[in-house]
């Protein structure tokens, strides 16, 4: 009896919850503005690419 009521509650909660659906709606960032997306991706990937070079430069300049 208790198990059935718990099962009904969990399925009704899942059924009542609704999220936006469609391309790009399940991402943690917005893809609506392509120029902002380009800038954010450039910063993200560019910082990862440039970090080793800055670290080597820092080590070479260190006395």
Curated annotation (Swiss-Prot):
It is a single-pass membrane protein. The modification N6-acetyllysine is found at residue 25. The modification N6-succinyllysine is found at residue 25. Pathway: Energy metabolism; oxidative phosphorylation. One of its GO terms (biological process) is mitochondrial electron transport, cytochrome c to oxygen. The chain crosses the membrane at residues 34-60. It is found in: Mitochondrion inner membrane. One of its GO terms (cellular component) is respiratory chain complex IV. InterPro entries: COX7C/Cox8, COX7C/Cox8_sf. It holds the Pfam family COX7C. Keywords: Acetylation, Membrane, Mitochondrion, Mitochondrion inner membrane, Transit peptide, Transmembrane, Transmembrane helix. Residues 17-33 are mitochondrial matrix. Residues 61-63 are mitochondrial intermembrane. Residues 1-16 form a transit peptide. It comes from the Eukaryota. The keyword Acyltransferase does not apply. Belongs to the cytochrome c oxidase VIIc family. Component of the cytochrome c oxidase (complex IV, CIV), a multisubunit enzyme composed of 14 subunits. The complex is composed of a catalytic core of 3 subunits MT-CO1, MT-CO2 and MT-CO3, encoded in the mitochondrial DNA, and 11 supernumerary subunits COX4I, COX5A, COX5B, COX6A, COX6B, COX6C, COX7A, COX7B, COX7C, COX8 and NDUFA4, which are encoded in the nuclear genome. Component of the cytochrome c oxidase, the last enzyme in the mitochondrial electron transport chain which drives oxidative phosphorylation. The respiratory chain contains 3 multisubunit complexes succinate dehydrogenase (complex II, CII), ubiquinol-cytochrome c oxidoreductase (cytochrome b-c1 complex, complex III, CIII) and cytochrome c oxidase (complex IV, CIV), that cooperate to transfer electrons derived from NADH and succinate to molecular oxygen, creating an electrochemical gradient over the inner membrane that drives transmembrane transport and the ATP synthase. This is Cytochrome c oxidase subunit 7C, mitochondrial. The lineage of its organism: Eukaryota, Metazoa, Chordata, Craniata, Vertebrata. The gene is COX7C.
């Amino acid at each position: 009896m208790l198990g059935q009521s718990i099962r009904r509650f969990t399925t009704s909660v899942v059924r009542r919850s609704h999220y936006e659906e469609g391309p790009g709606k399940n991402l943690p960032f917005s893809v609506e503005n392509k120029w902002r997306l380009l800038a954010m991706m450039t910063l993200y990937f560019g910082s990862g690419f440039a970090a080793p070079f800055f670290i080597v430069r820092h080590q070479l300049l260190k006395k």
